[in-house]
Amino acid sequence: MDELCFLWIFFCFLLSFWQGLPMAALFTLTADYFLLFTENYAAGLSFFLLVQIAYLQNLRMQPFPIGTIFIFPLALLFPLPLLGICYALLFFLHINLAMKKVQPSCSKKLYLFGLFLFLCCDLTVAWDYFHTPNPRLIWLFYAPSQFLLTVTARVIPIR
């Protein structure tokens, strides 16, 4: 199942060259590789920090600060719970900024729905930290969230 899920994220990565954010999609693909095929969860979560920064910069209509990539090796020094807190803060900032800056449109609704599904996925992952993980439930939220974020990231009108 992991290979099929990874192929879906790879498809979203390819789709991102059409109207998405290829850098965010590449970081997502890399994060998922670490989370699905290795035991290096800190590396996966560190790449998800970069994903959130890429989306935040898009909403701010600013280029991705290339120096931010140096967060990756530094983040590996932090314990996993601290990385999770940093990720959660960036993700909630992403949601907040998207709700404020994105003008009303069909694309906005799809983008925000993608963020909602992503949040549901992350809450499921957090819940699974205390219980037996349910990968199918995680991917039920994650796969469509990545598709919606990919196809709407560049077309959402921003104030």
What is each of the regions a protein language model found here?
Residues 1-159:
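Polytopic alpha-helical membrane-helix bundles and their juxtamembrane interface segments
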